[in-house]
Amino acid sequence: MEFGLSWVFLVAILKGVQCEVQLVESGGGLVQPGGSLKLSCAASGFTFSGSAMHWVRQASGKGLEWVGRIRSKANSYATAYAASVKGRFTISRDDSKNTAYLQMNSLKTEDTAVYYCTR
């Protein structure tokens, strides 16, 4: 009985930690090669304005690939991009909405992937 209560307590703690930070992506869809798409990442549970935000992606059957990042206002909102997307993708952010964006233009078939934001 004592073990069971401890286990339930541990699960409750882990669930609480898991829910502390939330990053919710939206805006995905199907587009033709050459098209455009804008993804959004709504953040909560941490100080968004002071955090760098990154985008990564994972194509089917492949590992994670870093796409790019945007730093905080204190770091002049500096951006950096993977060579594969530079000049086509643009990362921006709206600190008042706790949201980061990934504008993807001139899309290629090789851009097909699941996209994630992270901090």
Curated annotation (Swiss-Prot):
Transmembrane segments: none annotated. GO terms for molecular function: antigen binding. Disulfide bonds join C41-C117. InterPro entries: Ig-like_dom, Ig-like_dom_sf, Ig-like_fold, Ig_V-set, IgHV. Residues 118-119 are annotated as: Complementarity-determining-3. Residues 53-69 are annotated as: Framework-2. It comes from the Eukaryota. Its main location: secreted. Residues 20-119 form the Ig-like domain. One of its GO terms (biological process) is immunoglobulin mediated immune response. Residues 45-52 are annotated as: Complementarity-determining-1. This is Immunoglobulin heavy variable 3-73. It comes from Homo sapiens.
